[in-house]
Structures are given as structure tokens and as C-alpha cells.
Amino acid sequence: MKKVIILGSTGSIGTQTLDVIKNFRENFEIVGLTAYNNVELLSKQIREFNPKVVAVKDEDKANQLRENLKKNVEILTGSKGLQEIVKYDADLVVVAVEGIAGLIPTVTAIQRGKDIALANKEVLVTAGQIVMDLVKKKDITLLPVDSEHSAILQCLRGNDKKEVSRLILTASGGPFRGKKKEDLRKVTVNEALNHPNWKMGKKITIDSATLMNKGFEVIEAKWLFDISEDKIDVIVHPQSIIHSMVEYIDGSVIAQLAAADMRIPIQYALNYPTRNYINGINFLDFSLTTQLTFEKPDLETFRCLSLAYEALKIGGTMTTVLNAADEIAVSLFLNKKIEFLQIAEIIEESMKEHNNIQNPTLDDIINVDKEVKEKIAKKYMR
């Protein structure tokens, strides 16, 4: 039986991970769960899955949780709670918590020799070199939960990495595919949150609308698969049936196809290297799939993707700046403090102003993240 800790169990990926685990209760034991502030849902999860330990953001939430529960479960709090919970006996840590808050717990879990199922983008976007060096040193397995990276992993299995010509990440194009800059000047938050294919959290949905999500995935792919950025391409595929592809040096292309359901890559990460049937999964009916279309991304309109490639080429803390500026810019947009197109403008401005640090430490990364966010907030939250 595989012992599992889920960081961010009340979010989109966390709840779907537990939904998958319900299918294989005999194979998994939930050791720990964490939540930011959704105590009500966390209480339900505790009753259903009986973890030994949980963690929440602050003491008030912890007290609320104690009042809700009659079970004997240890409750940790704060950022230290996230770091402590991954020290408990477990085989796999699912990192589904959002933001830079996922970095230190992930590093701590790897240092403790635990395998990682990674759904947090910030970990590799900001500290890819540090994290993957540690993965090799500790000889653990780090598995991607993203549908695109899971697809690449599946397309690479059984093949020699030396024979890879390029990785091709597919993008749906988001809700504004085909629009030009002028069309996007007055888009609303609700319009940006209306993703055509995927049901996701608000932050990642906005990142999908700007194509920054795909930019982050390019950076992650570099570190996950140890490949240079000039061998990672992005293609817009509106149907979201092909989740990504690998092209080999003989011209062959291997693609992974599936319904747009995050439970499929979650299942693959949980059960790796085997596969299992999941109740309620839709199987593709190719007789109903009338066409698969592809187009180049519009880098002039959706500049965030270009900025991600630029940050990756520069290296060092520039990807941390990219991530931090995007995180707060998206928050400002969601709170109607800025317009949609200002997201890319704020990111570019932050990158231009940054004094880059090559080969940063974890402290450097955390400090740069904090400085960038504070600077943007001070300017736009007046």
C-alpha cells in the first residue's frame, strides 16, 4: 500500500487526486492533507480518508478544524506546518498547493527521500536546477501531473532521449484564441475565466488565457526532461485531444491522446509505472472526432509566452521574476485593479528592472519573489 501526503487537498488538483484515490482505496493510504483556508471541505476529507496529520494556514483555522472534528488527528499550522507534514512517513507527496509556498516543502520532501507528484508550476519555474539536481542526488522519482508533461513522459517511455528531435507542447489557445490585441483591451474577468476545454482554478485559467501557462510549461519541460529550450515548441490545438507530442530524429512523432480530464494524468502519476481504470472517465470516440487542427501561437498578441522563453534563456532568477510578476499581476486583474493586457506589461517591466542572479540559492529565489511582488503591489494597490 502506497502512503500519500497531499499538499493542497481542497484545491482543483487536490480534490481530483482524492477522487482518483477513491477508485483504488486498497492501494493507497492517505497520511496527510493540507489546505489554505477551506476548513469545511478539509473536515469532510478528514472524515472520509482518516489522515494522521493535517496542516492549515493559521491558528484560527486550526481551532475551527478542532471544533469540527471529533477524530484524533494532529493539526499543524503555517508555512512550517507544510514543511513538517512532508517529514511524516510517506512514499509519495502530491504537491498541489499553489504558488512559491510549494517550493520549500517540495525540497524538504525530496531531501527526505520521498517521491513527488508535481502539480505546482512554481517549483520548477523558479528553482528547476536546484530541484532536479536534488532529485538526482537523492535518487527519487519526480512525476509531472500536468497533462502536457504527463503526455511527454508517456511518449518518451521505451525510447532513447538521444533520439529526441523536439518536444511539442499543445495549447488550447484559451478563451481568446484568434483575438488580436485590440480585441482584448476591455475583456472582463468572467470572459477570461471562461476556458473552452478545462475546468481549473482561477489563477491557472487566467494564465491559460494569456498563454503564460504554456510559457511556464516550456520552462518546466526543460528541467523535467533535461532538454534545451530551442528543442521545445508550442502549437495551438483547440480540441485539447492531443496533450503533447515527441518528435524523433527519424521524423517520427509520438503523441498522447485522451479526453480533457485531469484525473487521467493524476492516475498516471499515482500508479506509475502502471495504469488503472478510473470510474467515470470518458474514452475517446474517434467517430465523433471530426477534426484535429493546429496553428502557431500568436506571440504578438499573447506576449507572455515570448517573455517565458526570454526568461528561460537568461536563466538565474529571471524565471522567478517572471513567475512572481505574473502571480501578482493576475491577482490584480482578478480583483479588477488592472486590465487584461497589463498583465504582460507588468511582467515585462519587472524583467527589465531586475538585476539577475545566476546560480541562485533557495534564499535568493524566495527573496527575489518577495521583492518583485512587493514592488508591483506598492505601485498598483494604491
From Swiss-Prot:
Its cofactor is Mg(2+); Mn(2+). NADPH binds at residues 10-13, 38, 120, 122, 201. It comes from the Bacteria. Its EC number is 1.1.1.267. Transmembrane segments: none annotated. Mn(2+) binds at residues 146, 148, 217. This is 1-deoxy-D-xylulose 5-phosphate reductoisomerase. It catalyses: 2-C-methyl-D-erythritol 4-phosphate + NADP(+) = 1-deoxy-D-xylulose 5-phosphate + NADPH + H(+). Belongs to the DXR family. 1-deoxy-D-xylulose 5-phosphate binds at residues 121, 147-148, 172, 195, 208, 213-214, 217. GO terms for molecular function: 1-deoxy-D-xylulose-5-phosphate reductoisomerase activity; manganese ion binding; NADPH binding. Catalyzes the NADPH-dependent rearrangement and reduction of 1-deoxy-D-xylulose-5-phosphate (DXP) to 2-C-methyl-D-erythritol 4-phosphate (MEP). Keywords: Isoprene biosynthesis, Manganese, Metal-binding, NADP, Oxidoreductase. Pfam families: DXP_redisom_C, DXP_reductoisom, DXPR_C. The gene is dxr. GO terms for biological process: isopentenyl diphosphate biosynthetic process, methylerythritol 4-phosphate pathway involved in terpenoid biosynthetic process. It comes from Thermoanaerobacter pseudethanolicus (strain ATCC 33223 / 39E) (Clostridium thermohydrosulfuricum). Pathway: Isoprenoid biosynthesis; isopentenyl diphosphate biosynthesis via DXP pathway; isopentenyl diphosphate from 1-deoxy-D-xylulose 5-phosphate: step 1/6.
